[in-house]
A protein has these predicted regions:
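Surface loops and adjacent helix of pleckstrin homology
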Residues: 27, 41, 76-77, 84-86, ...
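Loop/helix-junction capping segments adjacent to catalytic residues or to phosphate/diphosphate-binding pockets
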Residues: 30, 82, 124
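Acidic/glycine-rich C-terminal interaction modules and beta/coil loop segments
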Residues: 90-142, 146
């Protein structure tokens, strides 16, 4: 019977965002700054398995960095990641194991029905590497309730 109940509490063990417990909140309409849980694309899942980062079965917990109509960029020379002209962080060419990371370079605008997921950790695998995700992939909006 419990298997049919929606997930209410999420536990984040990664360093992409503060580790701890996050509570699901009503609605899926996202605004910049919201925390979301989403299913990564098949392409991302394949890369996760290939690079030994996990089994590709886990959902991602990130913040919404940009929504439809907003612009983001990765400078090809400096590898600076910016949203609406504001510096967010660096982009790395390899992970901690030396595996090549996807190379997203240039200026982009978030299309309607999509959002750009980001994290606070400089080493997080987020939109700075793979770009936007469809809003349809969002499983929940969450808020932190106990983090460290």
């Amino acid at each position: 019977m419990l298997e049919n109940m929606p997930k209410v509490i999420y536990f984040n063990v990664t360093t992409s965002l503060p580790q701890g417990f996050y509570l699901r909140i009503p609605g899926k309409e996202c605004s910049r700054g919201d925390y979301i849980v989403y299913e990564p694309s098949e392409e991302v899942k394949t890369l996760i398995i290939k690079n030994g980062w996990g089994d590709g079965e886990r959902d991602f917990l990130k913040k919404v960095g940009a929504v439809a109509g907003e612009k983001y960029s990765v400078d090809a020379k400096t590898l600076r990641f910016e949203i609406e002209g504001k510096y967010i962080g660096q982009v790395y060419e390899t992970d901690n194991k030396g595996n090549a990371l996807p190379k997203l370079r240039g200026e982009f605008e978030v299309p309607e029905g999509y959002l750009l997921p980001i994290a606070t950790s400089a080493r997080s695998f987020d939109g700075r590497y793979v770009g936007v995700i469809s809003e349809k992939r969002v499983k929940a909006r969450v808020i932190p309730i106990l983090t460290w």
